[in-house]
């Protein structure tokens, strides 16, 4: 109880029907997410032709999504069943830490996937090919940096507390302490705004390169008096373009999933009177649904 902010005490308990709905949602998303990401990992790791440096990033993305749902799914089922957080203050902090860690790792892995597509499509032969060593370094960087940032609340820079709905835990966005708020400012930049800017930058040039390539193919085909010009190299480039579209879709879905949680944090800091326990549900509902999207997108590819 000492971890629950006084702001939440002014609200009556949530409608009891919300908890069965959350249970159903978690079951519908949890099982497909675990199965989908496990299959993605298994297929990429056991199929020799898919063991490329770029696909190491895909495997890491599936791994972080799998671990997110694996660690979030059971506690959410338990707390929804009991209508409150029953797993103690220590596990509340661990739960919030793991959710942030795997979420942060996922977004930076997708940023690296986007940057790899940028390198292949925009720079082409002039770009340095992604090697296994470089892919492993990117993956290690995503985990180490994410772990560092997400560990900060354990050392007094912000803290992990129960959400207003008492079925999950997250960062303390209701504290008025300047040090605590500074963590949310920096974390928002690191996990949301910086990846967003990098992604937009890469895709602006990717789209330009794809458009220029397709126009060149059409013009060349017209000069030769044929409907299309698709040699082996063109087919390879077309495949790279399809992969770029898949990566762009995945990143877009990630930002759609995490934007509500970001907004909840900022509303909690600057306009808490508009924030009720029911609204806090949508933040992690969208965030956890993100872990389901990625295996679906990559399965289609």
Curated annotation (Swiss-Prot):
Free-text description of this protein's post-translational modifications in UniProt: Contains one covalently linked retinal chromophore.
Transmembrane portions of the chain: 19-43, 56-78, 93-115, 135-155, 183-204, 246-267, 279-300
Residue numbers on the Extracellular membrane side: 1-18, 79-92, 156-182, 268-278
N6-(retinylidene)lysine modifications at: 288
Pfam families (UniProt xref): 7tm_1
A Gene Ontology cellular-component term: plasma membrane
PROSITE patterns: G_PROTEIN_RECEP_F1_1, G_PROTEIN_RECEP_F1_2, OPSIN
Chief place where the protein resides: membrane
Top-level lineage group: Eukaryota
Motif ('Ionic lock' involved in activated form stabilization): 116-118
An individual GO BP term: visual perception
Topology of the protein relative to the lipid bilayer: Multi-pass membrane protein
Sugar-modified residues: 165
Keywords noted in UniProt: Cell membrane, Cell projection, Chromophore, Disulfide bond, G-protein coupled receptor, Glycoprotein, Membrane, Phosphoprotein, Photoreceptor protein, Receptor, Retinal protein, Sensory transduction, Transducer, Transmembrane, Transmembrane helix, Vision
Cytoplasmic topological intervals: 44-55, 116-134, 205-245
Single annotated GO MF: photoreceptor activity
Disulfide bridge positions per record: 92-169
Location(s), subcellular: Cell projection, Rhabdomere membrane
Subunit structure: Homodimer. Interacts with GNAQ.
Family: Belongs to the G-protein coupled receptor 1 family. Opsin subfamily.
Reported function: Photoreceptor required for image-forming vision at low light intensity. Can use both retinal and 3-dehydroretinal as visual pigment. Light-induced isomerization of 11-cis to all-trans retinal triggers a conformational change that activates signaling via G-proteins. Signaling via GNAQ probably mediates the activation of phospholipase C.
Name of this protein: Rhodopsin
Protein species of origin: Cambarellus shufeldtii (Cajun dwarf crayfish)
């Amino acid at each position: 109880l000492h971890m629950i902010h006084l702001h939440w005490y002014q609200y009556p308990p949530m409608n009891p029907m919300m908890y069965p709905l959350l249970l159903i949602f978690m079951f519908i998303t949890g099982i497909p997410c675990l199965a989908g990401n496990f299959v993605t990992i298994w297929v990429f790791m056991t199929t020799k032709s898919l063991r490329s440096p770029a696909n190491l990033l895909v495997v890491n993305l599936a791994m972080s999504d799998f671990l997110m749902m694996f660690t979030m799914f059971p506690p959410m089922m338990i707390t929804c069943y009991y209508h409150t957080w029953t797993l103690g203050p220590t596990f509340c902090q661990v739960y919030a830490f793991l959710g942030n860690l795997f979420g942060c790792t996922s977004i930076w892995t997708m940023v690296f996937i986007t940057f790899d597509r940028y390198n292949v499509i925009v720079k082409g032969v002039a770009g340095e090919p992604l090697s296994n060593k470089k892919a492993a370094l990117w993956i290690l960087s995503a985990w180490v940096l994410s772990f560092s940032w997400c560990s900060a609340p354990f050392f007094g820079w912000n803290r992990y507390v129960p959400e207003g709905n008492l079925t999950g835990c997250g960062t303390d966005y209701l504290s008025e302490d300047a040090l605590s708020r500074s963590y949310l400012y920096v974390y928002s930049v690191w996990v949301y705004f910086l990846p967003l800017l990098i992604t937009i930058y890469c895709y602006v040039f990717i789209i330009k390169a794809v458009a220029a390539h397709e126009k060149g193919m059409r013009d060349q085909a017209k000069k030769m008096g044929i409907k299309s010009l698709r040699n082996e190299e063109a087919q390879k480039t077309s495949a790279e373009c399809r992969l770029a579209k898949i990566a762009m879709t995945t990143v877009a879905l990630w930002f759609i999933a995490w934007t509500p949680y970001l907004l909840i944090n900022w509303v909690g800091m600057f306009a808490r009177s508009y924030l009720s326990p029911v609204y806090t549900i949508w933040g992690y509902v969208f965030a956890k649904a993100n872990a389901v999207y990625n295996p679906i997108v990559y399965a289609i590819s």
